[in-house]
Amino acid sequence: MNETHRIPSCFAPAVLLAALYVAPLGAQDTHFAPKNQQIPPPPCMTIRGAWEGGYVACTPLSHQQWLADITHWRNERRIRTGFDSSRYELPALQWAQSAFMQPQMMVHDRYFYDPVAGKYTVDKYVDDLEKRYGGIDAVLIWATYPNMGVDDRNQHDMVRSMPGGIEGLKQMVADFHRRGVRVLFPMMMWDQGTRDPGAGWPDAIAAFMKQINADGINGDTQDGVPLAFSLAAEKVGHPLAFEPEGGPSDEALSWDVLTWGQYQFEFVPTVDKYRWLEPRHQVNIQGRWVRDKTDDLQFAFFNGEGWESWENVWGIWNGVTPRDGEATRRVATLERSAAPFLISQDWEPLYPMHMYGVFASRWPLKDQTLWTIVNRNEYNSDGRQMSTPFKEGTRYFDLYHGVELTAAREGDQSVLSFPIEAHGYGAILATSSEPTAEVRQLMGKMATMTKTPLSAYSHEWKAIPQQLVPIEPSPLVASTPVGMVRIDGGDFLFKVDGIEIEGTDDIGVDVQYPWEDSARRFHEQRMQVKAFYMDKYPATNADFKKFLDATHYHPQDDLNFLKDWQNGTYPDGWANKPVTWVSLDDARAYAKWAGKRLPHEWEWQYAAQGTDGRIYPWGNCDWLPVGLTAVPTTVPTKGCSVFGDIKDALAPIPDKGRVMLPASDVDAHPNGASPFGVIDMVGNVWQWTDEYVDEHTRASILRGGSHYQPQGSIWYFPQAYRNNQHGKLLLMAPSYDRSGGVGFRCVVDAK
């Protein structure tokens, strides 16, 4: 039987008034309807100025009035939406109800995959998170954006490009399962411009996830995953937990059993609408860019829900501070142990507390009750915290500190006193029975943790440094090698911007050049460039075939290697097209064989731009005939030629179909030469240059853009045709990094 939450006798006359207040609610709108995805607190929790009567604490009566109002809203809303709870009762999906900690993990994270050893390192990844913040319950494995669109691979092609292909994916998922971690993948319904999957996305996703035994799907940018996806998964006998990024409709809670919560937080915690409608619905609070996680964690703990512990944000490291990591460990430990309480249909949020700025939720379960508590104040709170109706034989345990409390009886109330530190947490258990062995174990664990206050842990956020991967000089040459162009040295203003879609100019966006103290989006540096020789054209298929014939080179990770070749050679008519589907390591191997090296990015830009700051290698004019446009189109037109025919274009015509067409021959656009006479630098295929690395991510700078422009979404890998722009491609493994839109050219150092 649930513990009775009785009103003290002194409030008995007012109870009738409260009943009269709420009685008409069955026939009228509620007073506290949700705003966006959050239910507002009662008015008594609003701080008023002295001229408005000052602050008056909420009473049990005002709390009951508010609770009755939002309960009425919930009951009515369930009826109006035809709420169906059957999916929350499916054994295959019940894991989601206790999946409190879920990072979005970029597949490029160096803790997840070791490209040198050529193997997934799931244990290393999970061990690191256990050490830093107490581990995870689920993981969202992200292999698509921001790289998708660099060629015509669709979202599933990108995942299948991961090392080992399907068998590698199945083993990797099994490794997470072995560690007790459920696995989700994203789906991008905005991906309508790359290769057609050949089947409807609901069926394609259901079949693929069953094949690799994944547990769920995150709906990227979606405000609800449509019912068709759940039905498709159930049809193949593999139910999936669907988790939209945005706020779904209330109706969608019948099939979307997970949700991200991307909210703005006030001092007084609001009630999560989705959690209130169905306490078994798991919400993962997500604030990818915030550096102080206190609001996220406190809101999650108050609402009994989870947190998206996302640190590697598109290759930009926004790491959890030691203080937030320790807070996460404590919140996760308590929530995992209390999971059965946190799905209680009798949840009472904003339970009346004595101390200002301390807020609690009450979670009854059979003959026990749990309170999850947060202190929103910047100062410690100690003393009389809460009252609960007196009941003979009830014992109270401070689970957070791992100690039993002695309640003070005041009339018909038991008053509990305990400390809760600034921006801290509390958890109280009321029980009439002897604590179980599990509760005793939890208390021992929490007592050990909380010997050190959260305030003892650093809350300073720090960026992690990046390093440029060195490029060994080539053998020096005194005269221009065949097929190369001399680039005389000179004074150069190297000015370039990263074109990442997200991240504004936060520290960590883009790259950190050797002369900079942090990664950032906008770069400018005056330098002296030494003379060198550059390939007049990108390396062609014929060039690469000579390399293979001479060396019998074959990479250990050969998935997608020369994907468009057959029987060891390129298609007819492709000899003079740029070689693609080669990784950075493949390109380096070719360069070493040829006595060359890959260029530093500033060398590439210097060869393309010269010293006059031109927009494109050939000047400041767009390169397309009348009636066609390139991106970007905001270029000067005064003094530019008007092309009358496609053959007159200075670079390839953009390819906007779902299937990427072959690249142009490297010598097809001689009029697009740079000031030094280097050809085919822009708009045919991207070209590998420098690699950057930090503790968690590797990336390569791509230059020149490509002919491929998938349509229908702003989220595809953006083009960088201008001389002062570059692309940043996140690296994982050769199989994944190889692309039909990326080639390379080489340089040689001059004596």
Give, region by region, the residue ranges found by the protein language model.
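Catalytic domains of carbohydrate-active enzymes, especially glycoside hydrolases
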Residues: K124-T144, Q211-A214
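Aromatic- and carboxylate-enriched substrate-binding clefts and catalytic-loop regions
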Residues: G149-D295, F301, W314-R323
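Extended beta-strand/loop cores of jelly-roll/beta-sandwich
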Residues: Q28, P435-W602, Q609-R614, C640-S641, ...
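C-terminal beta-strand-rich structural cap/linker in extracellular carbohydrate-active enzymes
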Residues: D412-A447
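Active-site-proximal substrate-binding groove within the catalytic cores of carbohydrate-active enzymes
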Residues: T59, L67, H238-G246, D250-Q385, ...
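Functional-site microenvironments in short loops/helix caps that host divalent-cation chemistry
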Residues: I487, H554, L559-H726, S735-G740
